[in-house]
A protein has these predicted regions:
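Short periplasmic/luminal acceptor-recognition loop of GT-C membrane glycosyltransferases, typified by
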Residues: 484-489, 503-556, 578
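Transmembrane-helix motifs of polytopic, lipid-linked glycan transferases
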Residues: 49-58, 152-176, 214
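Transmembrane alpha-helix segments characteristic
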Residues: 20, 82-85, 183-190, 236, ...
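Membrane-lumen/periplasm interface segments of specific transmembrane helices
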Residues: 95, 272-370, 476-483
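Signature aromatic-anchored transmembrane alpha helix within multi-pass, membrane-resident enzymes
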Residues: 75-83, 229-238, 252-259, 272-283, ...
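Membrane-interface anchor segments at the N-terminal boundary of transmembrane helices
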Residues: 149-160, 197-198, 337-413
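Membrane-embedded, hydrophobic transmembrane alpha-helices
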Residues: 1-71, 378-383, 426, 571
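Transmembrane-helix signature of polytopic, membrane-embedded enzymes
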Residues: 6-14, 151-152, 168-193, 210
Length: 627
């Protein structure tokens, strides 16, 4: 038995990757056995813990002291990052998750799986419940099944976020970027709005960036470390990245480029480890979900008819539309006096083409950046722009600030750019800036290796001030975040009223913060008229409703989707005596009326509610029907 080297601590990143891989693997296995329940979860993670104890001497080792030394530094950059991290942690502890995608389908699918004690293809018009990647959900499932609460889910993102600074430094420096410059970016980049706003959220975009960075980190270590574990960990990390979100699949390309560049090192001791990891990597990647999508829909995406409208019909329109959305989210200040719709400013021919080929196009900018649409932010974009300008200027002037270009790093960065363009030419979503969260680190690194500068660049006052401003600009966003406000919202509303702030501004403020305050259980009042003993409740929805709140209190009832095409006998046969009906679903999706539905089902309306799920949509009418 080999002893751990003196002074070395556990490689916590490796443990996180192993834990994530085990969670995905055990989720699928327990589902197949029908044991996705407390007993199965306890047995599974007992095996994982036992394996860690038995093989503790062989676990990857790293230096855990360097990070603490950096945080104890008197320099401002680590302190600002630490401040933002603490603020994010407070928000995560204080509030229930309110991410809308999480409430509409990500947590909802976990609720279905836990009720059925395994993964299942859910009969629903919210198809995202079925075809989306499952990586984040397999981390949520054991927490929910054991503790029957969603208040711990923020820890998934928070733990992952803690690894980001060290990974940025490792990947950047291995790409040939000077260590001084890498040191600054390791603090600046994690303060990007898309990362810090999701650090205590239940969103599943930014945490995939950590898996991607980890996959490169362990590949780069193949040459400097004799450990055969690095190739295996890299393989697992890249698989986890794809399992989290299918939109991350193009990022496999730069990983393969690094594999090619490291082929001689991998051909030795690392090859058996990587080959051994491949079966597990396949199981925890997006591939199982792709195969299930093919089985149930005939298409690996799960959306053969593009019902979600997320596949653009023209690659050029995709690149242009996504670029405009990136500009809208990242070239404006984090705080704006009022919302602005930039669509009318487009030339008429371009506007017509984008609305035809890129239906989800959204050029509305709100008063502040929120996690649903945030990218890295204006400060980081300006800082990257400064490196481009200074790099060109230094090269033209023949300045000594110019560093030598690293050609292999250029190949990796070029592959990252190609991956981003592939995404932008194929995918059309209104949330481009958020969905590209895993792409930004390599794109920023691409700027730094294309326009290489000597480490003395960080001593320039302009760089330091711009870096500090970029980091500090995230502080008000974390404090003002509507999903997790760290200030007394009601007190501020009263002060605004007494200070004669225009009524429209106060009304907008009140609506946004009140909607977010209720979002985690926004539909719960629909359950109030239903007797407590009802174990199954019908649900007729639009496909984008916050279903998770209907399951409260968790474990007491199952929500089953119905449609107007179902007969009364079909509905009753499923044990349903009450149905919750969205008027918007009847009007816009099924093109029918509540009167028709009541007549068909011989039902009566026992309650009618007006509920605001999203601040920009306003109140929606809901009915509680008794059969």
């Amino acid at each position: 038995m080999t002893c751990a080297r003196k002074g070395a601590s556990l490689d916590w990143l490796a443990l996180w990757i192993l834990f994530s891989a085990w969670s995905s693997l055990s989720g699928w296995c327990l589902s197949g056995l029908g044991y996705l329940n407390p007993a199965g979860i306890i047995f599974s993670y007992s095996l994982f813990l036992a394996a860690l104890i038995v093989f503790r001497s062989r676990l990857p080792r790293g230096s855990g002291r360097a990070g603490w030394r950096m945080l104890r530094s008197r320099r401002m950059a680590p302190r600002i990052w630490l401040l933002l991290t603490v603020l994010a942690l407070i928000g995560g502890i204080a509030y229930s998750p309110a991410n809308y995608d999480y409430l509409t389908y990500r947590f909802s699918r976990v609720l279905y799986w836990s009720w059925d004690q395994g993964w299942s293809w859910i009969p629903t018009i919210n198809h995202r419940m079925n075809y989306s990647g499952t990586g984040f959900e397999w981390l949520m499932a054991p927490l929910f099944i054991l503790f029957k609460t969603d208040r711990l889910f923020f820890l998934i993102n928070f733990i992952s976020y803690l690894f980001m600074p060290g990974l940025v430094f490792s990947v950047f420096s291995h790409l040939g970027i000077g260590k001084r410059i890498s040191w600054w970016w390791m603090w600046i980049l994690p303060c990007g709005y898309c990362y810090i706003l999701q650090a205590a959220s239940a969103g599943n975009d930014s945490f995939a960036a950590v898996y991607f960075l980890a996959s490169l980190h362990y590949l780069f270590r193949v040459k400097t470390s004799s450990s055969v574990k690095n190739p295996a960990l890299s393989c697992l990390a890249i698989a986890l990245m794809t399992g989290a979100k299918a939109s991350n699949l193009p990022l496999v390309l730069p990983w393969l480029v690094v594999v090619f560049l490291k082929r001689r090192n991998l051909w030795g001791k690392g090859a058996p480890a990587m080959i051994a990891a491949i079966p597990v990597a396949v199981a925890i990647s997006f591939l199982p979900m792709a195969l299930l999508n093919i089985h149930y829909t005939g298409d690996y995406t799960g959306d053969p008819h593009n019902a979600s409208r997320m596949r653009v019909s023209d690659p050029l329109s995709g690149v242009v539309g996504n670029s405009l959305q990136l500009a809208k989210d990242n070239l404006l200040p984090p705080l704006m006096p009022r919302p602005i719709d930039w669509t009318p400013f487009l030339p008429a021919p371009l506007k017509a083409r984008l609305l035809r080929d890129f239906p989800p196009l959204n050029l509305n900018s709100g008063e502040l950046q929120i996690e649903e649409h945030a990218g890295p932010g204006l400060g980081i974009v300006l800082l990257a722009g400064l490196f481009i300008v200074m790099g060109i200027r230094a090269r033209v002037a023949g300045s000594s600030l110019v560093a030598v270009r690293n050609n292999p790093a250029l190949a990796v960065a070029g592959a990252g750019l190609v991956a981003g363009l592939v995404y932008m030419s194929k995918m059309g979503s209104e949330a481009t800036s958020r969905l590209l969260a895993a792409y930004y680190p390599l794109l920023i690194a691409g700027v730094l290796v294309t326009f290489p500068l000597d480490g003395r660049m960080v001593h320039r006052r302009l760089f330091r001030w711009l870096g500090m401003i970029a980091m500090l600009s995230a502080v008000p966003l974390v404090i003002l975040c509507p999903a997790r406000p760290l200030f007394p919202t009601q007190v501020v509303s009263s002060l605004m009223t007494t200070s004669h702030v225009p009524d429209a501004i106060v009304a907008r403020y009140d609506r946004v913060y009140s909607v977010y305050a209720k979002r985690s259980d926004v539909l719960r009042e629909l359950i109030a008229p239903i007797p407590a003993g009802e174990r199954v409740v019908g649900f007729l929805q639009t496909g984008n409703d916050a279903e998770a709140s209907l399951w409260l209190p968790f474990g007491t009832r199952k929500i089953v989707e119905v449609t107007p095409e179902d007969s009364r006998e079909d509905v009753k046969a499923r044990g349903i005596r009450f149905v919750l009906v969205s008027q918007n679903a009847l009007t816009y999706h099924y093109h029918t009326t509540i009167s028709f539905l009541l007549a068909k089902w011989s039902g009566t309306v026992v309650a009618e509610k007006s509920i605001i799920e999203m601040a920009n949509l306003g109140p929606e009418t809901w009915y509680v029907i008794s059969l």
